[in-house]
Amino acid sequence: MNQNYNDEYEVMETDERRYHPRYPLANTPGLELQQMRYKGWMDRCTNEESGALFTDITVEDAVTIATSITAAVLGISFPVGAAVTSIISVLVPYWWPKSAGAPGTPSAQVTWEQFMNAAENLSNKQILESKRSDAIARWQGIQTLGRDYYQAQCDWLQDQNNELKKSRLRDAFDDFEDALKLSMPFFRAQGFEIPMLSMYAQAANMHLLLLRDVVQNGVSWGFQQYEIDRYYSNTDPLLGNPGLIQLVESYTDYCVHWYNTGLQQQYANNRYNWDAFNDFRRDMTIMVLDIVSLWPTYDLRRYPKPTKSQLTRTVYTDLLGFSGDREYLQIDIDRAEQELVQTPNLFTWIRKILFKLQPTGVNFVRGRSMSFTYTNSHNGYEENKGNPGEIQETIDIPAPYVGDDIWRIDTRVNTSSIPNANIVRGWNFSFTKSLDQQIRWQPPSSSETIVMQGLSCNGPSIHSCDLCDSNSPCRNITPNYSFPCDNKSIYSHRFSYLGAGLKSDLTALTYFSYGWTHVSAAANNLIDAEQITQIPAVKGYNLVGNARVIKGPGSTGGDLVKLGEDSDVSVSVTTPASDTTLGYTIRLRYVSKLDFYLGVSIVEPDASEISRNVLLPATTSGDNLTYTAFNYYDIGFITTITAPQGEYILTLTNHSLEVGFIIDKIEFIPV
């Protein structure tokens, strides 16, 4: 079984870098084609309801809301030390939209209903009505107490030395936090953990953000320091409740466990339905794992400044084309994973797709070649599949720093007299800045449909929200629910990989799927001058020796780099232009079963080099990459003189540890 997490692969060989000349593409005039979403196209092909769950409107809406919430948390840059409204205030309009209904009523809990409905559809399991009703009733109370908390916070912000307002705010906080704490068991009802998981993840997110509030502002509200310390961390087995640190651990491990359990169930129940398996993986990644990966940054004592995070995972849209036979609509999941999913590698940027065409007969695509580069580097590799063709046409993608992404793909598909044979006949790749590029080899026909694929839109760009202002625009946030996103100014994912499957009996590539990465993955590893910058280790550009990329555990927002004995990884980062001298502490988030010496080398823009060996302590004794298996270590300090942007090369080397160690992120902390 090739699941989304916990498998290891060797890094692909990158010796071949054969590039091919570009063939000019033209927008050939054709018939006016009907444009459909995937489910509509499948219904047209089969005259029955399709199992393509991602286009169920409930799933779409829940995924869009989750996408917007994650984007909001990624984009927030509140000053940590300032007395400001909570990060929660930015998310309230998504959790409880103003148009949903009167506050505290069942109708106002539409977002939580959508999360449950979506996970029900994806897991093929319905929540018992009594359990659903209990959860909704809990949300009614939480909303009511939350509104008291926001009001008390607004009152205090206007008069921060008023002891009565401080007292009321402390009481409102305690009531709100108690309601969340007492409700969490109702959001993980036994037997329904998976269909309630996307709702649970957002409930946990709310609880953690609320505890972050009290750690940040509790002294100003009049709490004693010992009380704040307990809200931050409490390991006493008998007294009090777990603090923020303990809850990040337990909530993370819970969400990852039930995500993996659900994915295993999809694998077992849908062996010849990769779409169902992939739907669960993609949508639950967006609704659950993406926000989970940001929870470590809620620790204000470890992240005392706003933090710039990135998601590097890849998600895939539905299979298009003909992969099965008369008995099964699709090939088995294992085969589809091998053909359609990119092998774990350093994070890549697609630069060229070359199609090898044979424009005769039924099947036209004989082969395809893709060229990739790594982040902030000309290093890369080429991946080939299939056979030679008579004609070659290319799609050229500009360099990553240009920011001209492919944000949507329209695929020309038509049905055939062969059962289950829906034939892909061409593509239109939509770019965010330049003109569309097309691949087509025959004129359109009346039986064709254009299938649009991409991911949800991000929510409105609001970096702060003042709920205290009755005229604040964020009180009326309305996400763009179009799917795929119809506005290239707020797209959430960029196209990154063209998976293609070869049917040996036809010597042609007959089925395809598209990989997409999140737009938070930056093109040049730019370090922020004022915020903590997280650079995932997979954003490196070179692996040497026994280094390889392994699948992440689900809680890290992407894959990890494992350094075996005598191996290293190099990462290129860009420092910002500055009028003053900038300094950064470099910190690793890593996993190791033994103490070991890590070699650290930094090559500066003037080619001077700083090297040192650092003793890193073991972080775990086991093999499972649970939350507590990861730990942090400050490995050094760099400064930059007053200068324009510069490139630094950071190389991490394992000289001696035979069992190897795993790197999640490299963090640059301004000092």
Language-model regions, residue ranges each:
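Short amphipathic alpha-helical segments that mediate assembly, nucleic-acid/protein binding
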Residues: 5, 29-38, 59-62, 80, ...
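Short low-polarity hydrophobic stretches
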Residues: 87-91, 95, 353, 409, ...
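Membrane-inserting hydrophobic helices used for pore formation or membrane fusion
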Residues: 3-6, 10-13, 156-519
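Membrane-active, amphipathic/fusogenic segments and juxtamembrane/transmembrane anchors
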Residues: 2-52
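Membrane-inserting effector segments that mediate pore formation, membrane fusion
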Residues: 47-123
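Intrinsically disordered, low-complexity coil segments
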Residues: 101-109, 156-164, 238, 577-580, ...
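Charged, amphipathic alpha-helical linkers/stalks
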Residues: 107, 111-156
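Extracytoplasmic
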Residues: 396, 400, 404-671
